[in-house]
Design a protein with these regions (language model features):
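Extended, Lys/Arg-enriched charged tracts that mediate electrostatic binding to polyanionic substrates
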Residues: 144-184
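Positively charged n-region of N-terminal signal peptides that target proteins for export
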Residues: 1-5
């Protein structure tokens, strides 16, 4: 099944097509059906689970909390019955039977504990089920063995254990490299070292010892899926595509194996993809190898990110497509600015996954990265964006619960999975316990689920996202500046990239200026974007977007192919803003001079200390460089480039928002995430007949509004009055 069809069979997605069959949208908004409610993770935690307990808790979850289903998460050493045994599946079957009776839906959580990939070894019962059965299918690590020698001399070395990936000698002063990989004989490598100081390096791929599946190897992942997902299908086929509508994976990551995750067939697959041998470039994974460092790292780290994306998530997605259900899940440590040895590429890792996801957990600033994940969905034309939300945040207030949800939905999330309900509420490991048994939450959960159901009704759809601003996702500069064994440690990404201001720029746009945007992946800019007049178009069948401004956040290295297209956009009348640091290097071999020349053509005074510079093209294009980007500088630059944006707020009265277009309707969701009341006039491009739909109450009203023009552009001004942590929809038919 094509992944674009996944949402049609997912009850939790609640696409508009699900409403259309005779149902009245306004009536559904007032009293949303159960299928739009949230479905929390349900921890079967550190206790013996019984059929009686399952039935009782599911009934209460629906009747007392308004939940629409669950994702069952076996957890802890005390959980019984044993994972993946027939007794376990008997209980799971009881849960499915009760869910069907209650008209609830279920999502298969693919692990015992977390992260996904070991079948119980971590946060489960400690049994390494996958590793015990498939020891060669577990995570691999790239090791480097090195020594310095002074030539001329004879050098020889017995090969260390593991699969040899590369052997290179590098002269330390001039960075000359000699590939010795083909000189292996009888388990040794020998070479006559020329004059100079040389670093002799042997790179080997070894089994790490981590119990998780090799995320980079699709064949290994197939074996994991056979051990887990397939076992549910073998027993519960009749529930697939109805009661069971999806799977969920949790926290795979490449920071395992000391951040040096690798796989044995890396070189062979690299050659097949790129047409040249990566072995001579392996030293760049750790060291500066001269002028080719940045491009070499982009090829090597970029290909590892591709293997990661086509490994674990893609294999699971393909299995789900075949079995009529959806697939979602999220990475670990999404909050790391440099993801190269964590998720590899926080946009591309979701390229082949039907529903990209994120985890709002503890005090981590996941909200700064929601737009990266939702932009991945927009880039690759996906309807849904999931968030596992509230875990380990403690007994948070209702205000915080709503605030988090509003921020997520204004930034593109549209499938919130609460964390969590606990089978044994006396053994809660990660608060809050969001159930009828908790005094703080019991009375408010029904109201909360009605609110979330209304958000889902309106936003869980394949409507087209509208944004005037594109921001280039700077994976090229992140990969170019990255190296293995960085001083930050693998858990925090290893290496800080000083020019990487993309997260700050994104937050300025979203939370300070009230300007929505889409991160554009370099691959998508090359393959799916074209120019139409002075706009840049993202050419997706469903989520097609038109950008009037392109922002290049801080880069030292950029894809030459991207820069050529951005320059053509500027020449055609497009508007370009660059921030912080301008690129001087190409992510492709042989194009550094092209990058320098083009940047100078766009920003001729780019290195002046004044901080702002640029020029205009003959066709009306503008290019501005903000050396020290602030919210004010960014606002001034944007206002000078475009007369009217899609949505505009009065300065100092900005709200967070998202705008989608679906079935002839404009759907604007606005939220006040500040601490003071906002009474303001919101300017919407076009001549609209707006209504206010209140997700807190289900009420619908006609606001105060007026029509006017800015220059030749039609504008509708709508009066909005929102208290802190309150939200509203503006719904309007598309103008003729």
């Amino acid at each position: 099944m094509n992944v674009k069809l996944y949402a049609l069979i997912v009850a939790s997605s609640c696409l508009f097509c699900c409403i259309a069959e005779g149902a009245d949208l306004k009536q559904s908004f007032a009293e949303p059906p159960l299928k739009y409610a949230t479905r929390p993770l349900w921890f079967w935690n550190n206790t013996a689970v019984t059929e009686e307990g399952i039935v009782e808790q599911m009934q209460a979850a629906r009747d007392k909390c308004g939940y629409g289903g669950f994702g069952i998460l076996p957890f802890g050493k005390g959980f019984k019955p044993a994972y993946l045994t027939e007794d376990y599946f008997k209980l799971y079957g009881a849960a499915l039977s009760k869910a069907k009776e209650l008209d609830m839906t279920m999502c298969i959580y693919d692990e015992y504990g977390f992260p996904s990939g070991s079948a119980g070894a971590i946060h489960g019962d400690g049994v390494r089920r996958f590793a015990n059965k498939h020891p060669k299918g577990t995570i691999k690590r790239l090791d480097k063995h090195e020594e310095e020698v002074t030539g001329p001399c004879d050098w020889s070395k017995k090969l260390p254990a593991g699969r040899v990936m590369s052997i290179v000698g590098m002269e330390m002063k001039g960075k000359k490299r000699v590939d010795l990989t083909g000189m292996i004989k009888d388990g040794k490598v020998a070479w006559r070292v020329p004059k100079g100081t040389w670093k002799m390096m042997i790179f080997v791929c070894v089994v790490d010892g981590d119990p998780n599946v090799d995320y980079l190897d699709p064949e290994a992942v197939v074996k994991f899926v056979e051990m887990t997902h397939q076992q549910y299908y073998n027993r519960f086929k009749e529930y697939f595509g109805n009661t069971i509508d999806g799977t969920f994976f949790d926290e795979p990551t490449m920071y395992r194996a000391k951040g040096r995750m690798w796989t044995g067939r890396f070189n062979d697959k690299f050659k097949a993809r790129h047409g040249f041998d990566p072995a001579p470039y392996y030293p760049a994974l750790w060291y500066d190898i001269g002028t080719k460092t940045q491009a070499a790292r982009n090829y090597l780290f970029g290909f590892r990110a591709e293997l990661y994306a086509t490994g674990f998530p893609k294999v699971i997605q393909e299995w789900c497509d075949k079995h009529g259900i959806a697939a979602t899940g999220h990475q670990d440590q999404e909050e790391v600015v440099n993801p190269v040895s964590v998720s590899g590429d926080l946009m591309k890792c979701f390229k082949y996954q039907g529903i990209p996801g994120v985890d709002k957990i503890g005090g981590r600033a996941a909200e700064r990265f929601y737009k990266v994940i939702s932009s991945s969905a927009y880039n690759w034309d996906k309807a849904l964006v999931m968030s596992e939300t509230y875990g380990a945040m403690g007994d948070i207030s209702w205000e915080t619960i709503y605030h988090v949800a509003m921020e997520q939905y204004t930034k593109g999330v549209n499938q919130l999975i609460p964390h969590a309900v606990w089978y044994d509420n006396k053994k809660v490991s990660f608060k809050p316990e969001l159930s009828w048994r908790h005094k703080k939450y019991a009375e408010g959960l029904q109201l909360y689920n009605k609110y979330m159901s209304r958000l889902n009704l309106m936003l869980q759809n394949d409507g087209r996202h509208v944004a005037d601003i594109a921001v280039l996702y700077p994976i090229a500069t992140l990969q170019a500046g990255h190296y293995l064994d960085g001083k930050l440690g693998h858990y925090k990404g290893g290496v800080a990239i000083p020019e990487a201001d993309y997260v700050d720029v994104g937050e300025m746009l979203s939370t300070e200026l009230g300007r929505d945007f889409t991160f554009i992946h370099p691959e998508v800019l090359d393959e799916k974007c074209s120019m139409k007049g002075d706009t840049l178009r993202l050419n997706n069948p469903v989520n097609h977007e038109s950008y009037r401004v392109m922002i290049i956040p801080g880069h030292k290295t950029i894809n030459w192919s991207n820069l050529k297209k951005i320059k053509a956009f500027y020449d055609n009348g497009g508007k370009v803003i660059a921030t912080g640091t301008l690129p001087r290097k190409s992510a492709e071999f042989g194009h550094d001079e092209d990058v320098v020349r083009t940047i100078e053509a766009l920003f001729p005074t780019s290195e002046k200390a004044a901080g702002e510079s640029g020029r205009a093209s003959a066709s009306g294009g503008m290019a501005i460089f903000l050396k020290r980007p602030t919210a004010k500088a960014l606002r001034d630059a944007l206002d000078g480039m475009q007369r009217v944006y899609d949505v505009e707020f009065e300065e100092g009265k900005e709200l967070c928002y998202i705008h989608k277009v679906k079935d002839g309707k404009h759907i604007y969701f606005l939220a006040n995430l500040g601490k003071t009341r906002v009474n303001t006039s919101v300017a919407l491009r076009g001549t609209l007949q707006p209504e206010l739909w209140n997700p807190h109450t289900g009420g619908i009203s006609r606001p105060e509004y007026s029509h006017g023009k800015r220059g030749t552009v039609d504008v509708t001004k709508v009066r909005i009055d929102l208290m802190p942590t309150r939200s509203t929809f503006i719904i309007a038919p598309q103008e003729e």
